[in-house]
Amino acid sequence: MMAPAVRQALPKATDRITLGKSGLHVSPICLGMTMSPETVIAAYDAGVNFFFVTGDLHWPMYDGIRKGLAKLLDGNPSRRDEVVVGVVSYLDNPLFAALQFHEVIGEVPGLQRVDLLIAGAVSSDQSFYPRVDAMARARAAGQNGARAIGATFHQRSLAVVSEQYDMLDIRFIRYNSAHPGARRDLFPYFRSVRTSPVFNFKSTMSQVTPQMFEALNLPKSYWVPDVCDYYRFVLTRPEIDGVLCSPMHPEEVQQLARALEKGPLTREEEEYMIWLSSLVHAPVLT
């Protein structure tokens, strides 16, 4: 996998990306938390085949995606081989090592297995290396059907280490218009040719809503990016292969698909969004 120097077009939901050496192929759009089970169906119909579910923290907030996956698979067992389901645990060792991902399997009829094991909220060496070891052993043993492992990073230096040493099949990082520090201490250190993808989370955390914009008393002629423009901001970076997103309702899936068709932002638009977010979320997070 070679990252382009400049992105000419944004990824589409129907595209597929290989997860490391797992043999699994995922859409660049990964669906996470949602209020409506119908959102899962709409995402699948739009080409999304990658889903993100929690195994512990925020369990009630993922009820919509669990029910949506159950509905997607009900009466259509062949669909199970078309989708990739990742389950994240935010527990540290020794609890993490128990790998209680089977609870999600039991909660979603037809799920049968967890394709991707994810260590959540990696913030230190202690929360990373022991969990990587546990996941690698589980992957080697095919525990709960696992074929791939990944992590969500709060400490970017560890994301660099994991990429340079091919420790994971996927990594999730945090980059947005109020949190642009990855430009300085992460993206320059990623190899141009990678064996595993980089996905982003918290892409819209930096949104300046119309109400926030109005309170700034800026000229009416200034651009007010909509929520999907924040995904465009993230995916404009060629180092990022996909995004974890949380559309609450089916129509938001279509809105995202249409937004991605607009293509990448210009450099001026990127800088404008960073500036605008800094006015509301000041000081700008690095």
Question: Where are these predicted regions, by residue range?
Answer:
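A structural motif
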Residues: 48, 111-114, 168, 240
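N-terminal binding-site loop/beta-alpha segment at the start of enzyme catalytic domains
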Residues: 1-83
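Short, charged beta->alpha transition segments
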Residues: 69-73, 98-108, 158
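Active-site mouth loops of central-metabolism enzymes
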Residues: 26-38, 86-97, 214-224
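Active-site groove signature of glycoside hydrolases
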Residues: 105-127
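Beta/alpha (TIM)-barrel catalytic core signal, keyed to glycine-rich beta->alpha loops juxtaposed to Asp/Glu
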Residues: 5-13, 33, 120-286
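Acidic-and-aromatic substrate-binding clefts and catalytic sites of carbohydrate-active enzymes
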Residues: 33-38, 53-65, 90-97, 123-128, ...
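Structural motif corresponding to the early beta-alpha repeats
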Residues: 74-96, 120-121
